[in-house]
Amino acid sequence: MQRAAALVRRGCGPRTPSSWGRSQSSAAAEASAVLKVRPERSRRERILTLESMNPQVKAVEYAVRGPIVLKAGEIELELQRGIKKPFTEVIRANIGDAQAMGQQPITFLRQVMALCTYPNLLDSPSFPEDAKKRARRILQACGGNSLGSYSASQGVNCIREDVAAYITRRDGGVPADPDNIYLTTGASDGISTILKILVSGGGKSRTGVMIPIPQYPLYSAVISELDAIQVNYYLDEENCWALNVNELRRAVQEAKDHCDPKVLCIINPGNPTGQVQSRKCIEDVIHFAWEEKLFLLADEVYQDNVYSPDCRFHSFKKVLYEMGPEYSSNVELASFHSTSKGYMGECGYRGGYMEVINLHPEIKGQLVKLLSVRLCPPVSGQAAMDIVVNPPVAGEESFEQFSREKESVLGNLAKKAKLTEDLFNQVPGIHCNPLQGAMYAFPRIFIPAKAVEAAQAHQMAPDMFYCMKLLEETGICVVPGSGFGQREGTYHFRMTILPPVEKLKTVLQKVKDFHINFLEKYA
């Protein structure tokens, strides 16, 4: 093609009109001859296609950011272009992102982060001394006294020490070893990392991972990615989403026919279900794990989000140690926490940690090796995690303001949890269990037979159809229960309770009006 074009250009010099035409004609003929000799080749097949890609990645689904969220993005763009809708904004109630919903950051955390990010501010009188003290300690532990340097793969040493001290305080003196602490890119990174080490075997010896249904879709996504076997155990919706050990026994016995159940995942407080497990339940689960030789994963990122006066958070680590050495020396446990939830709501920093106990020394080396492949978690996220576990204490300059802000966030969440539960339960065809903790409602919804048929005609799950209609008619984005798992024949959706109270009231009223109209339309 390049040669042909050059031949055509040759005829463009200064010539008489007649000679120019003959020259152009001659050049064009020669170019045509070249093209006949070297025909343009068709584009070759792409190396990476849906057929050739990693099938485990293709099997991954993550409902929290799935099709309905993509549709919400499309609608937002349409609103920006001036396309008329029955609403003026999309309310993203699909995800637990507190600050995106208007929650203000905790002042002390942002002060320390500002000081760590721009150390020249350490000379400013505008910052309290306790914030400066923490910032200096973090920076002194970083290479070059900068958050911009890599840390050790396991995390900054002094931050791991602070995490261990926090766990010891939280658990009433039960010791925590900094060497068992691994700082992570959010809790999700820790969960996927530990599962990578746990999954092995093939055929009937392939690792089975027990997860609650409903579950947080991270678990099913990682299980698919690792080509492990998902083993479902169902929470008891009729008993406030309680975990029943008899259901665990059923699940593990049935799974042994086709896999090797090796891992038991617990989410406490529950996501999406909002239940808080009793101490007795946790003891029963630990005994079951010991009995069946299961590795326990305790997802405890909502440990500060407990609202019911009748409930209290009990860490698996604390209960395990209080059950005595037969359990505390033998049951392998990884527990997880994060900067994203609680009262801090710092999702964007991607800070987290995992504590892993009773790990074989040789496996600990393998875990550190795996972590070293990604070098280290974001050092800014590690710093944010430090402030979560090492906040101001009584007698420090920032303590009163910090306490007010913390109590305000958690108090408002408790009010919104009760408001959501009460208003949903006033709507015919909606039932919502008590929201004991976390930051979501997971109401059960009645979907008429005609709506189920309409959903099938659109090749959608009935609750996806319901949630899509809710989005298109009200602008409210929630996640269908089918994305979390649910018992056959039941339908739910997950909705965050994070919007400000007045906006939450508006959301709940819109859901109520939509649901009543939906029932009438498909009666």
UniProtKB/Swiss-Prot annotation:
Modified residues (N6-(pyridoxal phosphate)lysine): K341
Function of the molecule: Catalyzes the reversible transamination between alanine and 2-oxoglutarate to form pyruvate and glutamate.
Spans annotated as Disordered: 1-25
GO BP term (any one): 2-oxoglutarate metabolic process
Pathway(s) it belongs to: Amino-acid degradation; L-alanine degradation via transaminase pathway; pyruvate from L-alanine: step 1/1
GO molecular function: L-alanine:2-oxoglutarate aminotransferase activity; pyridoxal phosphate binding
Matches recorded under InterPro entries: ALAT1/2-like, Aminotransferase_I/II_large, PyrdxlP-dep_Trfase, PyrdxlP-dep_Trfase_major, PyrdxlP-dep_Trfase_small
The entry's keywords: Acetylation, Aminotransferase, Disease variant, Intellectual disability, Pyridoxal phosphate, Transferase
Name of the protein: Alanine aminotransferase 2
Cofactor(s) listed: pyridoxal 5'-phosphate
Subunit structure, interactors included: Homodimer.
